């Protein structure tokens, strides 16, 4: 196929793109661009792709296109760079937790965790994800049951406090 022979040209999700554009009235023309793929979506498993679609939907829902948000942009860049070499599902959930905080709705408050019945282990994982520094190695093993509990909690949190019904809710719970 053309995609296999020539590649995507860098115009795909999760690609760092630098471009030159000109404006003619309401129309923009891109005259040149260079790209660097941070996370190759074509190499993700179905389960991993679902998790990253969740991240895309989260960004679309909580970060208006008209408003620039450098923190969110840098956070996504770090997360994609790390995900290219580490556990992609874990990286997607970590960046989801951190993006919610940047959007101004912190899922890690004690009151919310109690109200939505997050276990002590879930609270600890939430705190670890919330404060994770993308430049460091992840040292702590993550139990699958606690990971799934936290993923379900984030879905409930977004629905209740973000007032958004995510189309990709449950993405982190998929197993094949």
Each model region followed by its residue ranges:
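Non-catalytic alpha-helical scaffolds and adjoining flexible linkers that form interface surfaces
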Residues: 1-176
